[in-house]
From Swiss-Prot:
GO MF annotations, alphabetized: acetaldehyde dehydrogenase (acetylating) activity; NAD binding
A biological process from GO: catabolic process
Key words, A-Z: Aromatic hydrocarbons catabolism, NAD, Oxidoreductase
Protein name: Acetaldehyde dehydrogenase 3
Organism: Azotobacter vinelandii (strain DJ / ATCC BAA-1303)
Taxon lineage: Bacteria, Pseudomonadati, Pseudomonadota, Gammaproteobacteria, Pseudomonadales
Amino acid sequence: MKKIRCALIGSGNIGTDLIYKIRRSALLEPVWMVGIDPASEGLARARELGLKTTAEGVDGLLPHVQEDDIQIAFDATSAYVHAENSRKLNALGVLVIDLTPAAIGPLCVPPVNLREHAARLEMNVNMISCAGQATIPVVHAVSRIQSVAYAEIVASLASKSIGPGTRANLDEFTYTTSGALEKVGGARRGKALAIINPAEPPMIMRNTISCLTDAEPDQERLSASILQMVGEVQKYVPGYRLVNGPLYDGNGVSVFMEVAGLGDYLPTYAGNLDIMTAAATRTAEMFAEEILAGKIRLPTPEVA
């Protein structure tokens, strides 16, 4: 079966984990890994796995996009450089999945709104953040039943799972995730908080989700909606688990989740990596299905 050929931009934790997710896909093939440090472990591992590599950033990939038929690129670099990366790749007809908090394209959470993005050709979609992918489905599960005045999420992440790129983008991480709780989750106001936990041994990713509904919670319908949504996420993130809840207190609804990874690149405590890379892979697969079926066509680049 024909596969859509992909490039991975960024050779850090997220980019390296993506290699394994995409290699398992029936629809996607990883072909290029792009970095900026010739000595990076991610580039070395990519070469071992048979990918072509460059340490010259996106500019090192551009001359090879057409000859290697790259149609989808995953950008796992930084919010600060994403817009320029995306502009250069889009100009060559490459669809970009954005794993930075840049959020220049529409925000995507697979079980909430992926199908609508795939149905129309978006050349850049943003995966928000690991915390967003872990918590927005639950907020949406509440807001589709009852209006939510306020949603607050707290993500606790093992320090060892947070690379320099994510650390440099923590402000953008908070801002983008807070906004996505509103735009995608459906809350009128959203607030996202991240705790980077240096404990040894490293702790699994944990998420606390609190919603304040306008009316008294319809506990039976809300619980059913939340459990259904947890099942949807588990289809592509098997380690996504409801630990406690939903708990009800007045108009408050609280849910406690944890996310274990598959252990592809970092150990299983790094569920924050897995939920981000799995969501991005699922998103790319949906676009790949549409491309392979001829339902959407990527633009043909103009040859100078």
